[in-house]
């Protein structure tokens, strides 16, 4: 057996992925399933239902779970449902999050709380209820979605910068606390990635007027926005969710068995 075949495999593993209805979360679920994992796809919407069905058609077990990651009761019930459906949990990907493109001066308390609750509190709650299971099972892997914003601030995005910095700090803290239980905890720090969240960012900043261009003018503005997102990084191109998902695969696999507490920057060089 080749080294890559032995280590890049998730055969027999069960992975929970939050925010799995679209974007990076969906790409992670699809890639994990491709490499043998059964995937529990968690989202506040019903988007996961159809996508889980598509994964099952490929011969891998997948199931959608509707959950509000900001509600401890919802999270607890979801983790219990995953255990009932799959029997064990080996991998947790805390990916759910939103972006608010405003400065401290412009951000309302409600916007601040919502960004914090989904991106940071949700990471805390799922970890709180999954880690005891991993301890009983002798170990596990947690991969959190942070951002390049945790390292280099994004202009006019105070809540988002704070949330992602918090996710990176929480990652390090959990790595220290749970290493003795054979639980590895890392985070991935993407840059601008072509996902629905990036489209939301363009709409919030007024750089585009629609995420579904219908006229030549709308398409030109959309293309210019996407192109501009890659202009200021050394690779001079924007990344895709599928490309980012491979870093999550690496961190979930035995290929990274000595890595914990790390922040893995995958941003085309923006933070260089």
List the predicted regions and their residue ranges:
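Active-site helix of classical SDR
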Residues: 127, 163, 171
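Substrate-binding pocket helix/loop in short-chain dehydrogenase/reductase
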Residues: 103-104, 111-116, 229
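C-terminal substrate-recognition "lid" of short-chain dehydrogenase/reductases
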Residues: 124-127, 135, 235-266, 271
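Conserved glycine-rich cofactor-binding loop
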Residues: 14, 21-22
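Residue(s) in the substrate-gating loop at a strand-loop-helix junction
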Residues: 147
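Alpha-helical segment proximal to the catalytic Tyr-Lys
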Residues: 132, 176-177, 257
